Amino acid sequence: MMNFLRRRLSDSSFIANLPNGYMTDLQRPEPQQPPPAPGPGAATASAATSAASPGPERRPPPAQAPAPQPAPQPAPTPSVGSSFFSSLSQAVKQTAASAGLVDAPAPSAASRKAKVLLVVDEPHTDWAKCFRGKKILGDYDIKVEQAEFSELNLVAHADGTYAVDMQVLRNGTKVVRSFRPDFVLIRQHAFGMAENEDFRHLVIGMQYAGLPSINSLESIYNFCDKPWVFAQMVAIFKTLGGEKFPLIEQTYYPNHREMLTLPTFPVVVKIGHAHSGMGKVKVENHYDFQDIASVVALTQTYATAEPFIDAKYDIRVQKIGNNYKAYMRTSISGNWKTNTGSAMLEQIAMSDRYKLWVDACSEMFGGLDICAVKAVHGKDGKDYIFEVMDCSMPLIGEHQVEDRQLITDLVISKMNQLLSRTPALSPQRPLTTQQPQSGTLKEPDSSKTPPQRPPPQGGPGQPQGMQPPGKVLPPRRLPSGPSLPSSSSSSSSSSSSSSAPQRPGGPTTTHGDASSSSNSLAEAQAPQAAPAQKPQPHPQLNKSQSLTNAFSFSESSFFRSSANEDEAKAETIRSLRKSFASLFSD
């Protein structure tokens, strides 16, 4: 076969009949191999060869009949065989990778050494600057993906795989990306009763995917209803008492039909779940209270009522990790809502009383890493706690840069704690592809007989048990006929021929006969458990087998091979390289 290819590719008529530009490497003359210097013996041999060869088969000298000049190629391939097999190998690799038969290519060092942090916040705060240059787990960078809830979407599977889609506008350009975050920092409210402010489905999806976050996704979902949070504060009030935890009185109405009991006026009615002073109305008398009840009927939600406190100032006690700050806000415009109009904000000393408030509230819902307690200080000299905020609380005061740095350090600390115990899963590798491999690999190892290839084409029928362990030969041509009885006939022929090479060895070959016959008997039973030992029907160099050996298929693919076949693959590749080198060097 090799001689036929050498003669065929060396034929000048075969090259001349090719279209212009096709296999240009064969049509282009080789300037690096000039004809030998003319001598008396060489001239005589050349003349004899020219006289003996027919006209169409005569190879003209390059100087007298130059080869047709093909179109200039930017980067010609070194040989036809290498270009053919490289293109075929690339096509097979791409097809196998797209079908999931081989492992996905290993990510680059930059992608392996980075953890993705998803920050859900408004764009006025650039969290990428806060995490720039920070590392976790020793040498992993932090890649920040920042977006609002309205710009996110996700899909999560029960096996732990998930993907987050992000559509953001950057400088007027719509950017669409899909990624897999390793950690989530939520700085935005997940639910509001205004239009298009309900993002609880995204929180559910993150919990479904098992994403770690600050605060916990369970607590974020629980904070989507303020009466639910207030119920937790009622439990703290009952535990600590009114002196240590002065909680304001509040009445809960699940719907408008229950708003019949008249409270002590004036009261503040809060409708549904809202933020930044929305849905809060000051009611002076029972007539206004009835009007508010009719408004609650249209909203089809719950409402709460609490006594109006004539306050001197508001108090906010915040906790970020182990850092505590207390602020006092005084209204200048005289509005009963201190967040409306003009107000003066200043930081006050952190007392043990304030610290007890925020520490007690930080233990609800399994623990809050970031939280704040809001209270009012009345003109009667008493404090009244009325609300708790979670990680979506806005940063206030002159120390916002410091607070952002505290949040950054807290996120890094949590990522070091949680991600170190979480193995990184490849998003494109199936989780169950490596399990069925264990059973098929134990049989060849137990019998100490690695899968062998058939003897070469035209060679002697050497039994598989007698092949040298370090040398594997290409397959031979199989006789045409039905394929079903081939396994039994091959096993019987191998067992009958196993004793033939042992005859010239004298009486010392008795043990070798027994071992070879036992090995051949074991191999006769092996084809049902090891289908890789079936002979290949293709005779020409067994190209499919050589291509299979050229690819590094792992245990997750359908090519089941043992560790002993690595030497066989290397030997086959070396033999193919030598064959093609001798073929195209002529």
From Swiss-Prot:
Neuronal phosphoprotein that coats synaptic vesicles, binds to the cytoskeleton, and is believed to function in the regulation of neurotransmitter release. May play a role in noradrenaline secretion by sympathetic neurons. It comes from Mus musculus. The gene is Syn2. Residues 1-29 are annotated as: A. This is Synapsin-2. The modification Phosphoserine is found at S10, S426. Belongs to the synapsin family. Residues 421-440, 508-522 have a biased composition (Polar residues). Keywords: Phosphoprotein, Synapse. Residues 61-77 have a biased composition (Pro residues). Can form oligomers with SYN1. Interacts with CAPON. Phosphorylation at Ser-10 dissociates synapsins from synaptic vesicles. Phosphorylation at Ser-426 by MAPK1/ERK2 and/or MAPK3/ERK1 may play a role in noradrenaline secretion by sympathetic neurons.
